[in-house]
Design a protein with these regions (language model features):
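Short extracytoplasmic/periplasmic juxtamembrane "stem" segments immediately C-terminal to an N-terminal membrane anchor
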Residues: 33-47
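Short, Gly/Ser/Thr-enriched beta-strand-loop segments that form substrate-interacting elements
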Residues: 92, 253-295
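Active-site-adjacent helix/loop patches that line small-molecule binding or acyl-intermediate pockets
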Residues: 65-84, 165-239
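Active-site-proximal loop and beta-strand segments within enzyme catalytic domains
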Residues: 140-172
């Protein structure tokens, strides 16, 4: 519980800082009105600017240390906003291994990718983000729909699960809702229907190159991969706008406690060690992805 509070506190703190620095930058770039005795002029920056593009998140290089990953070997991706980097280091401290990605989705230059390890780590419920995207990709291709039903097999049934019965058929929507609430039987049935390889392929198409999905919907991923995936949804990668909106709407309903301190339009998923979210507020959007574990 203490660890979940730490990650939740980190997300709230960093989002507040991102909003603060974004507002400061916006004020600095604003047009300045010069008041003179008889007239007024507006000083404009004549340099043409292109529309914002989200900067491609690169894979940070692994610190050159021995077999142990030392928490003080913190690396920031080239181009990272130094104010954000400083704040991330301050919040994370030196006692944990961590990966943090923060990206302003309306300003490509305002981002930070900071970590002391770039390895993929075990994830729980967060891995279901990839299953959710794969489900909607199947619908987008016409291979599944609202009338699709799946019969629960003995292999699907999780020990102690009283929600689903072997041999009974359930609709995809019902299974999807149960899966997102943590039901292992539903996750197994949906994974079997789609196929682990197809889910892995969807992850790769979203840019999650270090992610590996297991048959029981656990697996390994990174904060960077999760950020790429959420940003991909926001940009309409793999899923068109209609189906990407459905995924985000689903994530808005299943808001984890880790982001309970945030306000605005929030699309998030998380577990004990990972959390990823997109927050829309005041006409802007931000993505935050975090992995942290206590030694």
């Amino acid at each position: 519980m203490k660890h979940k509070i730490l990650i939740g506190s980190l997300i709230v703190t960093l989002f507040a800082f991102i909003l603060y620095t974004s507002n400061i930058k916006r004020v600095e770039n604003a047009q300045l009105k010069i008041v003179e005795p008889n007239n007024s002029k507006v000083a404009k920056n004549k340099k043409k600017t292109k529309g914002p593009k989200v900067k491609k998140l690169e894979k940070p290089k692994e610190p050159k240390v021995n077999s142990i990953e030392y928490s003080n070997h913190v690396k920031a991706q080239k181009g990272s906003n130094q104010k954000l980097v400083k704040q991330i280091k301050k919040v994370m401290g030196i006692d944990d291994s961590f990966q943090v990605v923060a990206q302003d989705l309306t300003n490509s230059s305002h981002f930070a990718v900071v970590s002391n390890t770039n390895k993929a780590h075990d994830a729980g419920k967060t891995m279901r983000l990839f299953l959710l995207i794969a489900l909607y990709e199947q619908e987008q291709k016409g291979k599944m729909g609202s009338r699709t039903a799946i019969k629960i097999s003995k292999k699907d049934k999780a020990k102690g699960d009283k929600m689903f019965q072997v041999g009974i058929t359930y609709g995809v929507s019902y299974l999807r809702s149960a899966m997102l609430k943590g039901n292992k039987t539903a996750a197994s049935a949906l994974t079997r229907k789609i196929g682990v390889n197809n889910i892995d392929q969807v992850a790769k198409k979203m840019g999650a190159t270090q992610t590996k999905v297991n048959s029981n919907m656990t697996g390994q991923t990174t904060a960077n991969d999760l950020a790429k995936t959420m940003i991909g949804l926001y940009q309409g990668r793999v899923l068109n706008r209609q189906y990407a909106s459905r995924v985000l709407a689903t994530l808005a309903k299943e808001r984890p406690s880790l982001v309970s301190g945030l306000s605005g339009g929030i699309y998030a998923i998380g577990d004990d060690d990972f959390a990823v979210a997109i927050v829309q507020t005041n006409g802007r959007a931000y993505c935050m992805s975090v992995w942290s574990t206590q030694h």
